């Protein structure tokens, strides 16, 4: 059996892959940052991770 250790950030605008050990969990969903977890990544210029672009228009 395979154990999942990483998943895509649950934010629909984000492209980040987040380790489940380091993720910010909200309602059982993994997020890469506080701004993605609280749904404000667009308003806050993205999550700040290189290459993501979730803060882009």
Curated annotation (Swiss-Prot):
Protein's UniProt keywords contain Nucleotide-binding: no
Protein name: Metallothionein
The keyword Chloroplast appears for this protein: no
Top-rank taxon: Bacteria
Function: This protein complexes cadmium, zinc and copper.
Keywords of this entry: Cadmium, Copper, Metal-binding, Metal-thiolate cluster, Zinc
Matching InterPro entries: Metalthion_dom_sf (IPR017854), Metalthion_fam14_prok (IPR000518)
Molecular function GO labels: metal ion binding
Gene that this polypeptide is encoded by: mtnA
Pfam family, any one: Metallothio_Pro
Family under the similarity heading: Belongs to the metallothionein superfamily. Type 14 family.
């Amino acid at each position: 059996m395979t154990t999942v250790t990483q998943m895509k950030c649950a934010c629909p605008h984000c492209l980040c892959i987040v380790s489940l050990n380091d993720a910010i969990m909200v309602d059982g969903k993994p997020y890469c940052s506080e701004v993605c977890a609280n749904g404000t990544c667009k308003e806050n210029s993205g999550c700040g991770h290189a290459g993501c672009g979730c803060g882009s228009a």
